[in-house]
Amino acid sequence: MLSNDDAAKVLTMSNTIAALEQLYQDLGAGAAVYRGRTDLFAPTVAEIGVDVPAAHQFKTLDGAIPRLHAASIRVTSDVVAFPEVNGLRRRIKIPAATGKSYVGLVFLFSSATGELISIIQDGMLQRFTVGAINAIGAKYLSRHESSVVGLIGAGGQAGPQLAALKEVRPIRQIRVYSPTPGEAEAFANSTATALGIEITAVASAEMAVEGADIAVTATNSRAPFFPAAWLNPGMHLSCMQRDEPMDDCFKEADIVVFHTRLKEHEYVSTDFATMEKRFGFVIRDHPPRDLDWNDFPDLGELVAGKVNGRQTPQQRTFFLNSTGVGAQFTALAHLIYSGCRERGLGHELPAEWFVESIQP
């Protein structure tokens, strides 16, 4: 059993990017496999303290990597709410578990024996993997000399996005905007020292990205806000999740690459009818978009060289971290497990607790 603290002693942004880049080589060559994410939404009796739509979201992702002799399934069990902030719908996770905490675990299995070999808390892993995936997209799609970043969002995922970009590009200046009062300033003050980069808080999203080499969105918005008009020649747009860019970005960008073409499968309890009528909001993780994901190449194809990355300095490129895939958690769970075994970290649990003599 491995905690977030254990994972933090093994994971670096550098080894995370390396492990995931190798995974996308595997995926592009057909040498790894995953299924689309599954989300179950059901009513919750949790006291969330605000009068907004809320639900229990039970999410699973799985994937296998033969090269590592490993497979995993990631499970999150979240109480989520969907408030409106400054006219935009957001999704927030409520710390409803014991001690005001969250529930997210990766179960790592050996494909040699079929046995469960590790249970890993997923918080640290998740922060590293999202930033690393977007950085890999930037490595193949942004200009090599890109040094100025416009960042929209200053929450928990913003710092890892910048740390990952710094691994692949010579970042020297960042402008950050957040609609939450004081958040951008606090983020700039705390993160500038940690990264050794000049970070300035600005008054609007457009001011953040104007003249930037790379525009990064790292928000929990469930309403699109980034228009194609902000895509300047030579810019690379890196979106952390698919509800951030407006539809015209997909049409106007010269190159668009998705993390994956597979969408998650959402199953919503019919008990929400009354709530949906009251709030005028349909419970789901992401609102529907009129886009055919099959029209776009994925990151595995880009990394494996099956599709072209940036060809000219003036091209406007766009990477969308459309949704997570289980294989990314397999790759990093195996990295954490191997590193923790070498260091003697974690808590050993009896193997016989997780096997059975009766054939299932």
Where are these predicted regions, by residue range?
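N-terminal ligand-binding/catalytic initiation module
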Residues: 1-127, 133-135, 145, 326-330, ...
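Adenosine-phosphate binding glycine-rich loop
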Residues: 4-8, 249-360
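Predominant activation on well-ordered alpha-helical scaffold segments within soluble catalytic domains
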Residues: 17, 21, 131-139, 162, ...
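Short internal alpha-helix immediately C-terminal to a glycine-rich phosphate-binding loop
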Residues: 129-150, 156-168
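Nucleotide donor/acceptor-binding cores
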Residues: 145-147, 172, 316
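Residues in the short beta-alpha loop(s) of Rossmann-like NAD(P)-binding domains
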Residues: 155, 179-180, 243
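NAD(P)-binding Rossmann-fold cofactor-contacting core
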Residues: 168-195
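Rossmann-like adenosine-cofactor binding region
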Residues: 196-286
